[in-house]
Design a protein with these regions (language model features):
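Positively charged n-region of N-terminal signal peptides that target proteins for export
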Residues: 1-4
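Bacterial Sec-type N-terminal signal peptides, specifically the leucine/valine-rich hydrophobic h-region
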Residues: 11-14
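Bacterial signal peptide processing site
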Residues: 18-22
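Post-signal peptide N-terminal segment of mature Sec-exported envelope proteins
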Residues: 25-50
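C-terminal amphipathic alpha-helix
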Residues: 33, 97-139
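Generic structural concept
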Residues: 37-40, 44, 64-71, 91-98, ...
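Alpha-helical segments in soluble extracytoplasmic regions
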Residues: 46-87
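Long, amphipathic, charge-rich alpha-helical segments that form helical bundles/coiled-coils
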Residues: 70-116
Length: 139
C-alpha cells in the first residue's frame, strides 16, 4: 500500500502541476446543461436554415431578430452558472455576431444577399464551436 501511495505521489509531483490543474478543472467546471446545449443548437439550426431566405429582406430581418433573441437568452442563461466562463464567453460572441447582422437590417433598407449568407455562416460556425465546448462538459 505504501508503494502505491509513493508511486501516486511521485507521479503527480514529477509531472508538475498539470495533473493537479486538470483534476481541479474537471472537478470544478460546470457540468453539461441541456438548456445551454438546446439554445446553442437553436442558433446553429436557425442560422443554417436561414441561408435559404437571404433573398427575402423581410424574412432575413426576422431571422436575424430571432437569432439575436436566442443568443441573448443563451448569454443571460450562462451568466450566473458557477465555473462556466467559457460558455458565457462563447454566448457573448454569438450575441455580437447576431447583433451585427440585426443592426445591418435595421440601418439599411436593402442588405446584400452576400452579406446575409456570410454573416449566417459565421454565426453557424461560432454556434458549432460553442456546441462542441458545451457538449464536451462532464455529465
Amino acid at each position: 500500500m505504501k508503494k502505491i501511495l509513493i508511486a501516486l505521489f511521485l507521479a503527480t509531483n514529477l509531472s508538475g502541476c498539470a495533473v493537479a490543474y486538470k483534476v481541479y478543472d474537471a472537478f470544478f467546471m460546470a457540468h453539461y446543461d441541456n438548456i445551454e446545449y438546446a439554445l446553442t443548437n437553436k442558433v446553429r439550426t436557425l442560422s443554417e436554415l436561414a441561408i435559404e431566405d437571404c433573398k427575402d429582406q423581410s424574412k432575413s430581418k426576422d431571422n436575424f431578430e430571432g437569432l439575436y433573441f436566442i443568443s441573448v437568452e443563451l448569454k443571460n442563461f450562462t451568466q450566473y452558472i458557477p465555473d462556466n466562463p467559457d460558455a458565457h464567453k462563447l454566448a457573448g460572441n454569438l450575441v455580437e455576431l447576431t447583433k451585427q447582422g440585426r443592426e445591418m437590417y435595421v440601418k439599411s433598407p436593402s442588405v446584400s444577399e452576400g452579406f446575409c449568407k456570410i454573416k449566417l455562416q459565421q454565426i453557424n460556425r461560432s454556434a458549432e464551436m460553442a456546441q462542441k465546448v458545451i457538449g464536451s462538459k462532464p455529465r
